[in-house]
UniProtKB/Swiss-Prot annotation:
Name of the featured protein: Nucleolin 1
Example of a GO cellular component annotation carried by this entry: nucleolus
Source organism per UniProt: Oryza sativa subsp. japonica
SMART domains attached to this UniProt entry: RRM
GO molecular function: ribosomal small subunit binding; RNA strand annealing activity; RNA strand-exchange activity
Length: 572
């Protein structure tokens, strides 16, 4: 009885003395009241058909599997309890339910064990559970999935402290149950909550409902596990939600990290591209600087050539009887003629060309207007004389010059006509003395014949400057020791473009050799000269005219010139 008074004080219920009638009350009156309560519960059940939820039996089955010992204890205790005890407990529960419906919202302590509160809770979560099953398609998959909507309903009521104060609520329930049942039943109920928090509520509600032995008690059994399932589902879903939130939280930093890495990579690529551009720009600027240096104003080649244009004209297609006085008379109307040089052969005959020098280049250009005019019965050909280095050998300038394009290729002169019977040293001395007045001589070459050791009758003289070279050319036809010298510009070796021989004149060889050779050599050849010969002599005054045996007999002699051993092959 003392326990019942404690219960009434804790729940703040005034008529707590109702169960004091105890076991000495009338049995008939208790049975009548039970029947009235059963009929009232049936009416409530009929008025609220949505309270039948499909997942409720499954939850009961799960809890029956999880906690078989509490149910066994409940069944044993219910068997030992009397009908009077169950009736008295039912009356006491009814009184408490009517006056403690409001505290149920604060904490699920005593109303979870009552019948009406279980019915109310059964009616409320029925629809959310059904909706949850339709939405997710998994009505019986797990506690967190089937009871997720139940947790939302309990969240409207302050359900957070339920988890913390479950132990105290269970103790209060134990006290109330002990006053309603025997001492053994209360002991078995007190052992169950120590093992688990939420399932203990379901076990205690089962103990109270089994003792009633009525159909209303079965409905209470369905409602009580639902309340426990709500608590379990709330705790499970809180854990799941916390895990999901914890799982979602690292995803966001990972995405941020990926974005930061991508941004860093893009920034690095941009910086690399900028570095490459910076590295390339100096390379582009460097050639520009060199170009600016190379693009410095320079005097064009044409201007240079014009600045050093010669005042000398080349005359071609001249009459062989033309003299210097006739040339001066021809050009006296154009300007002042300083000198006239007519090229001659070794015998003094004219070669048909010459040079005329004027006082200025303007006068020389003006004299070009007389090109094609008749001079001593022939149309004269006029052209500006090329200064040394002002043209490319073997090429013609824009004026269509017809003079020898190899002229001016060097500052060397070719000399022949001197006494070739003298020794090499004496020939050298005589030539140096004869051309000393022209200018400084840098080299004198007198080729010698290897077989005879005598001079070939030719010599080459190099001068230091162009002026000396030009003066030396004027000495062509001059006398040296009783011999008339022939002076001309030296040609490179192998140049035999001019017919009539390099120095052979009218008696030259067939292919332009200097002394009658086949391809312009100095010492004759197989088909040299007009009178030919195998060697063509040493280049006398008239070229290869004094050649050897001549004719085409040289072919036969050339065939027998070999000195090797003769080999014959017999028919054997």
């Amino acid at each position: 009885m003392g326990k019942a008074s404690k219960k009434s004080v804790a729940v703040a219920v005034a008529p707590a003395a109702v169960p004091a009638k105890g076991k000495g009350g009338k049995k008939r009156e208790a049975e009548d009241e039970i029947e009235k309560a059963v009929s009232a519960k049936k009416q409530k059940a009929a008025a609220a058909p949505p309270a039948k939820a499909v997942p409720a039996p499954k939850a009961d089955a799960k809890k029956a599997k999880k906690q078989p010992p509490p149910k066994k204890a409940a069944s044993s205790s219910s068997g030992s309890s009397s009908e009077e005890d169950s009736s008295e407990s039912e009356e006491e529960v009814k009184v408490q339910v009517k006056k403690t419906t409001k505290p149920v919202k604060q904490e699920s302590s005593s109303d979870e064990s009552s019948d009406e509160s279980s019915d109310d809770e059964d009616a409320k979560p029925a629809d959310p559970v059904a909706n949850n099953g339709l939405k997710k398609g998994k009505p019986a998959s797990s506690d967190s999935e089937s009871d997720s909507d139940d947790e939302m309903d309990e969240d409207e009521k302050p359900a957070a402290p339920v988890k913390k104060t479950s132990v105290t609520a269970q103790k209060k329930k134990d006290d109330s149950d002990s006053s309603e049942s025997e001492s053994d039943e209360s002991d078995s109920d007190e052992d169950v909550p120590t093992k688990s928090k939420a399932p203990a509520v379901a076990a205690k509600n089962d103990d109270s409902t089994d003792g009633s032995e009525s159909e209303s008690d079965s409905e209470d059994e369905d409602a009580a596990p639902k309340g426990a399932a709500k608590k379990e589902s709330s705790s499970d879903e809180e854990d799941d939600s916390s895990e999901e939130s914890s799982d979602d939280e690292p995803k966001q930093p990972q995405q941020k990290k990926a974005q930061e890495e991508s941004s860093e990579e893009s920034s690095e690529e941009d910086s690399d591209e900028e570095d490459e551009k910076l590295a390339k720009t100096p390379k582009k600027k460097t050639p520009a600087a060199t170009k600016s240096q190379n693009d410095e104003p320079k005097t064009p080649a044409s201007n240079q050539s014009q600045g050093t244009e010669s005042a000398t004209l080349f005359m071609g297609n001249l009459s062989f009887n033309l003299n210097q006085d006739q040339v001066k008379e021809f050009f006296q109307e154009v300007g002042e003629v300083i000198s006239v040089r007519l090229a001659t052969h070794e015998d003094g005959s004219s070669r048909g060309f010459g040079h005329v020098q004027f006082a200025s280049s303007e006068e020389a250009k003006k004299a070009l207007e007389l090109h094609g005019c008749d001079l001593d019965g022939r149309p004269v050909r006029l052209d500006l004389a090329h200064e040394r280095g002002a043209y490319t050998p073997h090429s013609r300038n824009d004026t269509g010059s017809f003079q020898k394009q190899n002229r001016g290729s060097s500052q060397s002169i070719f000399v022949k006509g001197f006494d070739s019977s003298l020794e090499e040293s004496k020939i050298r001395e005589s030539l140096e003395g004869h051309f000393a007045d022209c200018g400084e001589i840098t080299r004198v070459s007198v080729p010698m014949d290897r077989e005879t050791g005598a001079s070939k009758g030719i010599a080459y003289i190099d001068f230091k400057d162009q002026a000396s070279f030009s003066k030396a050319l004027e000495l062509s036809g001059s006398d040296l020791g009783g011999y008339n010298l022939y002076v001309d510009e030296a040609k490179p070796k192998g140049d035999s473009r001019d017919g009539g021989g390099r120095r052979g004149g009218r008696s030259g060889d067939r292919f332009g050799g200097r002394s009658g050779d086949r391809f312009g050599g100095r010492s004759g050849g197989r088909f040299g000269g007009r009178d030919g010969g195998r060697r063509g002599g040493r280049g006398g005054r008239d070229g290869g005219r004094r050649g050897g045996r001549g004719g085409f007999q040289s072919r036969q002699s050339a065939g027998t010139a070999s000195t090797g051993k003769k080999t014959t092959f017999g028919d054997e």
